[in-house]
């Protein structure tokens, strides 16, 4: 049976990710769930600190710890928070000896990936900080927006040589297994045009790509809006990849 690795969006609670687990566990798949801490996603990554490499490596090591490294693996990646982690997983799958032999069946992207969209990133961060003290919330939002604007937008022509963005890395990623993109024109955080651009670029590299526009569902809410259709898309994709 396949192993499915779910990489949650920034601020995602495990109980939400568990609903996606059920799609696969009901079919007998082994499911691993992980969401990176928001501090790593919004600050470490923005500053070019590769702190997400550690959980990325640990997730792949789990396959060996549980002796399931010979099973096909499907990645289900949510928003840019999941994509940032997936980027390091991809790097290790192609550069670290024990991981090179893993059999990746495919990758599903839900509401991702997005480019350097500062407005969308600030909206996402504001959602994560919703329950926080108002003064601290606005201080963190200001600090993040300022850092991101300087390092990831204004200075990116220079900083990309040190730390390429996750989006630019994925455009030329060496992986060639099938990819499914689930996105929406109504997404206020990740632009549909950026997801479509990525899907088209990957297809031009010879990757088997399918892209589905849900049109009206908000960011990471496609399954909530269309549960039966969403589950069917995921299971059909997994079946086609095996």
Question: What is each stretch, according to the model?
Answer:
Residues 73-79, 107, 181:
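Conserved alpha/beta-hydrolase fold motif
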Residues 36-38, 112, 214-216:
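Active-site loop/turn elements of alpha/beta-hydrolase fold enzymes
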Residues 141-235, 240:
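Serine-hydrolase catalytic core
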Residues 18, 53, 192-196:
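Short, surface-exposed alpha-helical segments at coil->helix boundaries
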Residues 104-117:
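Active-site nucleophile loop of the alpha/beta-hydrolase fold
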Residues 39-67:
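Catalytic nucleophile-loop/oxyanion-hole region of alpha/beta-hydrolase
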Residues 85-95, 107:
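Short glycine-enriched nucleophile-adjacent loop
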Residues 1-41, 185:
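Short, surface-exposed "cap/lid" segments of acyl-processing enzymes
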């Amino acid at each position: 049976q396949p192993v499915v690795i779910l990489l949650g969006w920034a601020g995602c609670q495990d109980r939400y990710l568990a609903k996606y687990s059920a799609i696969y566990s009901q079919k007998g798949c082994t499911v691993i769930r992980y969401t990176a801490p928001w501090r790593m996603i919004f600050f470490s990554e923005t500053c070019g600190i590769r702190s997400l490499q550690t959980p990325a490596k640990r997730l792949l090591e789990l396959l060996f710890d549980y002796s399931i490294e010979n099973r096909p693996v499907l990645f289900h990646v949510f928003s840019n928070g999941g994509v940032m982690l997936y980027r390091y997983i991809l790097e290790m799958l192609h550069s670290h000896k024990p991981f090179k032999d893993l059999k990746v069946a495919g990758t599903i992207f839900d509401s991702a990936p997005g480019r350097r969209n500062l407005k969308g990133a600030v909206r996402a961060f504001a959602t994560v900080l919703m329950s926080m003290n108002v003064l601290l919330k606005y201080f963190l939002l200001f600090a993040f927006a300022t850092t991101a604007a300087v390092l990831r937008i204004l200075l990116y022509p220079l900083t990309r040589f040190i730390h390429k963005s996750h989006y630019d890395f994925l455009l030329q990623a060496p992986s060639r297994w099938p990819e499914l993109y689930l996105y929406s024109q109504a997404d206020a955080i990740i632009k549909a045009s950026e997801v479509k651009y990525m899907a088209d670029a990957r297809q031009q590299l010879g990757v088997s790509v399918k892209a589905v526009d849900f049109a009206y569902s908000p960011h990471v809410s496609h399954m909530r809006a269309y549960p039966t259709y969403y589950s069917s898309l995921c299971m059909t994709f997994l079946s086609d990849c095996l």
